[in-house]
């Protein structure tokens, strides 16, 4: 189960002499820190981490990384911060960012963030950080599924397949439907038959299709058991097709 605001990131975007840094975590503020003449990212981040740890906030864990500090807690918390004369030397966020520029260059493995993009529900997407060593440090971001969204279809309630296992022997078994891997219910919705009765199945143009009420749902092209998009950011010709008919009566 996903719980909002249990993680946070403080990203340093620049250092200079006599820059004042302010951070408030869960309503508690560190004493303002002014960077010395030898200020580097490591110096600033180490001092900020020490001061945050000194607040002794229950359940709070901090991790210093290349250009950021990651905070996690076993309960929701608030996070804010400022740095620089024009507040341009620190980015602070929790579960989401507006642009990719706000993300740290490195973070912990499996750190998931929502990119709001233009602000519209259908333009948002989720990224997960994959650390090369499986822990933290150098790595890359890849598109992923919202942590509050189900992975997809329930094979026990979906159509099954009859498999010829040997001469005159058949096995009725569940189909290994491809899990939903990216997006959420707004950007990569369930096919329309979910929650309804499937009345007919068919193949068309290298797709598996299902009829349900006044809708028709077809799989990825050439991938019969995949009813979801592979990206919430782009649309391709091979993506699933889901249509609603204007009437269920023959014309």
Listing of model-derived features with the role each one plays in the protein:
Residues 1, 55-58, 62, 108-113, ...:
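Short alpha-helical segments and helix-capping/turn motifs at coil-helix boundaries
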Residues 1, 5-7:
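Extended, well-folded catalytic/binding cores that form a central cleft or groove in large enzyme
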Residues 8-13, 45-49, 53, 97, ...:
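Short, well-ordered alpha-helical packing segments
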Residues 9-81, 108-131, 158-160:
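Extended, beta-strand-rich, solvent-exposed assembly scaffolds of outer structural proteins
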Residues 44, 48-52, 80-184:
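N-terminal accessory interaction module
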Residues 67-70, 170, 208, 216:
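Hydrophobic residues embedded in beta-strands of well-ordered beta-sheets
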Residues 175-207, 211-251:
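Beta-propeller and closely related beta-pinwheel folds
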């Amino acid at each position: 189960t996903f719980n909002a605001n249990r993680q946070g990131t403080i990203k340093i975007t620049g250092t200079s002499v006599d820059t004042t840094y302010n951070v408030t975590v869960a309503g508690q503020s560190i004493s303002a820190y002014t960077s010395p003449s030898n200020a580097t990212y490591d110096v600033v981040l180490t001092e900020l981490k020490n001061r945050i740890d000194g607040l002794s906030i229950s359940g709070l864990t901090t991790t210093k990384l290349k250009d950021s500090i990651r905070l996690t807690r076993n309960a929701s918390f608030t996070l804010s911060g400022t740095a620089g004369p024009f507040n341009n030397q620190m980015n602070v966020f929790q579960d989401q960012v507006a642009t990719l520029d706000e993300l740290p260059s490195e973070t912990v493995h499996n750190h998931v963030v929502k990119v709001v993009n233009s602000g519209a529900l259908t333009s948002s997407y989720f990224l997960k950080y994959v650390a090369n060593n499986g822990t933290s440090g150098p790595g890359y971001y890849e598109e992923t599924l919202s942590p509050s969204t189900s992975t997809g279809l329930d094979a026990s309630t979906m159509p099954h397949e009859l498999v010829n296992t040997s001469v005159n022997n058949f096995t009725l078994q569940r189909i290994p439907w491809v899990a939903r891997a990216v997006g959420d219910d707004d950007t990569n919705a369930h096919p329309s038959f979910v929650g309804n009765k499937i009345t007919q199945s068919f193949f068309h143009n290298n797709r598996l299709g299902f009829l349900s009420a006044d809708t028709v749902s077809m799989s990825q092209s050439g991938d019969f058991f995949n009813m979801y998009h592979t990206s919430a950011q782009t649309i391709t010709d091979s993506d699933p097709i889901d249509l609603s008919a204007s009437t269920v009566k023959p014309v």
